Amino acid sequence: MKTKYFIFTALMLTGIGFASCTKSSSNPTIANLTFLATLNGASEVPANSSTATGTATFTYNPNTYILSGTVNFTGIVATMAHIHLGAVGSSGAIVFPLGGASPTSPISFVSTALTTQEQSDLMNGLYYVNVHSAALPAGEIRGQLIQQ
């Protein structure tokens, strides 16, 4: 009788052990990344003496590949604003338009899913925010997006 009880108990405990073991079917969530930029005329290429200033705060979600954020500026009547591709000290092509024609502060932005190349450029510090004006159509204030 003791043998039957022992075998029954062992089988029950084994069954409970297997039942409590579950394989996670979801991938781990990766934390969002924050990118900040300080915009001013001195950061433009070439630099200018504008007294306008601005800030940009962007969040990149590596789980959805979405970049979103806000650009604030003062002392400028903007005609356009963009995120450009380019290292510090160099100019580059527009990657993402921000706020349409004649945007006002603050500008909010949400991307579609970034491509592998766009993700790489963002992570390598190759994106900058540029706010344009009628006086300086190539860009009045600029700031490099830096991961925090």
Locate the predicted segments by residue.
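Hydrophobic helical h-region of N-terminal Sec-dependent signal peptides
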Residues: 10-12
